Each structure stands twice: as C-alpha cells, then as structure tokens.
Amino acid sequence: MRKLIFFFFICLFFLFSQCQIQKPVEIEPEKPKISQEHLLRINDLIRQSMENKDIPGAAVMIGQKNQVLFSEVYGNSQLVPDPSPMEYDMIFDLASLTKPVATATSIMILVERGQIHLREKVKDYIPGFKPFLNEQGNYGDDARIWHLLTHTSGLPPYIKNENIPHHFGSFVTLNNMVAYIANMDKTNPPGEDFHYSCLGFICLSYIIKQITGQSVDEFSQENIFIPLGMNHTFFNPPEELKKKCVPTEVIEDLCLKGLVHDPLARVLGGISGNAGLFSTASNLSIFAQMLLNKGEFNGVRILSPLSVERMTEIYRSVFFSGRGLGWDLESPYSSSGGDLFGARSFGHTGYTGTSLWIDPETQIYVILLTNRVHPDDRGSVVSLRSKIANIAASSLLKKQ
C-alpha cells in the first residue's frame, strides 16, 4: 500500500514539474503575403500609358496599413516648355481629392466637436439657399449638410467656365460665389437624385469659415495636415516649393505649375472646398494609414473611429448614390477601385489624373498620381486606375 502511495506522489511530482518547465508556445503574427513580382506588372501598365500619350509620367504608391509595399515613379513630370524627369518628392495638384481629404474631413471634425450636425439645413449657414422648385411652382424641402457631402442636394455640377467672368466680374470672393450658387435653380429635390457637384463643396468650405472664422486651407492645416506631419500638403504651394510641383495644363501660353488647375478654385485664389489641395504620394500614404487605423496615425488622432466608419460607408439615406460622406464607394466615378476590392472599399479621384483607393478588408491602399492633363488635357487614366487597383488587390496571396 505504501509503495502505491509513494508511486502516486512520484507521478504527481513528475506531471507538476513538466507543467512548470513547459513554456507556452509563442506564435508570431503572420506577416502579409504579398507577391512583389505581381506588383511589378504595374511597371508595364504605366509604360504603356506613357507610350499611348495618356500621361507624361506618374507616381504610384501601394501600402498595407503601416507598411509600404510598392513605391515607384515613372516618365516625366513635364513635357513643356522642356522635359523634366519625375521624382519621388514631386507635388501634385490633387484636384477633387480635395473634397474628402480636406473639406469633408474638416466638416467631420466640426461634427465631433459639436459645432455642426449633418441634418442641419444648409440655409442656416447660407441664407437664401433656394430649395427645389417643382413644375407646379411649389418649393420642396430644404437641403441639409449631408446632402452637400453626398452630392444629393440638387445643385448642378459646375458653373461653365465661360460664364465665370459674366457672373462674378474680375474680382471674385467666396461670399459672392456662394451667394450666386445659393440662388441657382436646383435640379431635383434634396436626397432624390445624385449629381456630382463641385458647387456643394464650395458651399461646405463657406460653412467651415462661418463656423470657425478660418478658411478650409487654415482649418485643415491646423487640424489635419500639421498634426499628421503632412508637411508637403497645402493649398497654394509656397514659392520655394513650386519647382517641385508637377505642372498641369498649358492655358493661353501659361503652364499651370503650382497654380490650381480647377477654374473655380483658381478664381477663388486657389483656396476652395472642391479643389486646390496639393500633395505628394508619401503624404497621401500618411492620410490613408490614418483612415486604416480608424482615425489615428503615430499616436495622433484626427477623427474618431465612428467618424471614419460613417464617412466611408454608403450614407443610409441615399443608398442609391453609392456615396459616403465625401468618399466614393460605388458610383459612376468609382473606377479607381477596380474589380476585386470588396464592398467596403472607398476612395476618390481628381480631374488632373489623381486617385486614392482604400480597402479596409485587406488593409491595402492604392495611390496613383499623374498629371494626365499636361499639356493639353487630352490624356486619360480611367482604365489605368482600375487595372492598377486589380494588380494591387490580386498581389495579396493570403486574405487578411
């Protein structure tokens, strides 16, 4: 009996000692499996676009969350008056990427601070903002702030270039332009149709100034770009950096270099809610990482996680539009998302040939910066955007 008891305790001691000695197995997080060889297919695409004279050159950056996977520049930054090679730190006219990056983000910061809410009427900030007038001569509902952000306010897309001097004269201010926009006939009742409108984002920049006393330039610098360390992102690039700016169109013998391409932003002195922002591929990658990190980058929080979610999902009241709050998800303008990224992916394009697309599911972002309008506004990047997005998406060998 004693032998059995002794044997029993020996077994217990052995088991206990083994438990003490055995350490838990440390499992390293699996690194993303990316086919770098597959990403190199982008080189052939860009070269073909340059041979077709669709673009003079390009900068491409692809990343996954906090890691840059691919970064390359191609061709020339300009062709006239003299060819000049593209460089990694070149500054591009982002055109309509201004809308989500500067304007919509600024509005959402104000929402978080309780200084505005999205269902407020536009006319509360822009007196005289005329509602839709139907065939019976009756005015409809008032447009709300969210209608401006989703391009469903009923505002027309633009003001024809040839009408700008006629409507505003030689001296244009944001105040008199917004007064003119407010009085324009609306194309539809708010929330009933989607018409991509630069005018709505000009109104949003006016609203930012009404609330804060700052232009969209001043507010976005102070609350977005400086905190993030995006030190080559700005409206109206400083004189000492204009040599790094990629030129756009040549208009009346003037090559627009460091001067915004968009006509309405240009007559507003380069500062507008619809266009005017300049940046680099590396600076835009910081912004993309901030969104993928749910509003935070390097310990600096710009937006709350819920704000990022609301901005980057199709807005519930106008699901037909395929638009979020400033961002594009599934609209006629979303070609830069390609065919493979999921339904939660979002982004935006710019008329000058720029685009940013982000996929929260795979944590991949795709930045394509070109100056396809240089020198004569004949280039095209619609197909190129989609193909690069498809290569980026299919380079991921293991879904995260």
Put a short name on every predicted segment.
Residues 31-92, 115, 131-132, 182-183, ...:
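Short, conserved catalytic-motif segment at the N-terminal edge
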Residues 7-15:
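Bacterial N-terminal signal peptides
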Residues 46, 60, 66, 93-119, ...:
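Active-site SXXK
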Residues 78, 133-344:
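Short, surface-exposed loop or secondary-structure junction motifs
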